[in-house]
Amino acid sequence: MTERTLVLLKPDAVKRRLIGRIISRLEDKGLKVVALKFMQMTKDQAENHYSVHRSKPFFKDLVTYITSGPIVAMVLEGPKAIEVVRILAGSTDGSKAQPGTIRGDFSMGIEKNIIHASDSPEAYSHEMPIFFNESEIVEWSYGDEIIY
């Protein structure tokens, strides 16, 4: 089943010049970029995005970190996109993520962990409108569809 997922490349990914390498990994897997934005997340956007963590002790630090520099927001589309991106991203704690995953290769910790990916269709439905209007999602085809 084709589905969509929201992916954020966090400030550490941008500062470390990993944008192209990470997007290449996602596209190489067969995921299609249908929306892409380089932006500075506002405090309101961050608090909304991480609202499920509002009562947790790390919430304030999370908001401060994600707003500390520019991010890349994107919507990816493909079969089982949510599950596929979560597998490619690796464990939330980069020090425990498997080599070959994005976090396993580029992250050493849990706070600065390079990438965010929606963890469910419900999360995508909450997160996507924080960063994109429906009109910014581009419906397009490769022409000759690539089969993976």
UniProtKB/Swiss-Prot annotation:
SMART domains per UniProt: NDK (SM00562)
Name of encoding gene: ndk
SUPFAM superfamilies: Nucleoside diphosphate kinase, NDK (SSF54919)
Localization (cell): Cytoplasm
Sequence positions that bind ATP: K10, F58, R86, T92, R103, N113
Name of this protein: Nucleoside diphosphate kinase
Keyword list, A-Z: ATP-binding, Cytoplasm, Kinase, Magnesium, Metal-binding, Nucleotide metabolism, Nucleotide-binding, Phosphoprotein, Transferase
Phylogenetic classification of the source organism: Archaea, Methanobacteriati, Thermoplasmatota, Thermoplasmata, Thermoplasmatales
Cross-referenced Pfam families: NDK
GO cellular component, one term: cytoplasm
Active site as annotated: H116
